[in-house]
Design a protein with these regions (language model features):
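Catalytic-core regions of core metabolic enzymes
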Residues: 1-120
Length: 120
């Protein structure tokens, strides 16, 4: 059985990639990024969005695979239809760099749609 230190990546990560970060204040990707920056998080923060150059003063990366420094926690704030692709990027990053220790998926549009595709 794992000990409590295995949860450090969730509760005290050295770095966080916010996948689906947004410059639009009405989007969850903006709120999550803003909260990390305004509530005293001291680690490195990497916004990820292929359509943005920078968000809230931080350089934005097109993909998780483009971040040149270690990433410990990934926070997914993408549409349900993109989640599997992003999960594949996380697996590929872990294979290449061995650095992603945890991920949190806060995407909407799965089972609550009550469609076979969403439930899959």
């Amino acid at each position: 059985m794992a000990d409590i230190s295995s949860l450090n990546a969730f509760f005290n990560p050295a770095s966080v990639a916010v996948i689906g970060a947004s410059s639009d204040p009405s989007k969850a990707g903006h709120t999550a990024l803003q909260n990390l920056l305004s509530m005293g998080y001291r680690g490195k923060v990497y916004p990820v969005n292929p359509r943005e150059e920078s968000i809230l003063g931080l350089r934005c990366y097109r993909s998780l695979l483009d971040i040149p420094e270690p990433v410990e926690l990934c926070v997914l704030l993408v549409a349900a239809g993109l989640t599997l692709r992003v999960a594949g990027e996380i697996a590929e990053r872990k294979r290449r760099h061995g650095d992603v220790a945890a991920a949190v998926c806060m995407s909407a549009g799965f089972g609550e749609l009550n469609t076979p595709e969403a439930k899959e």
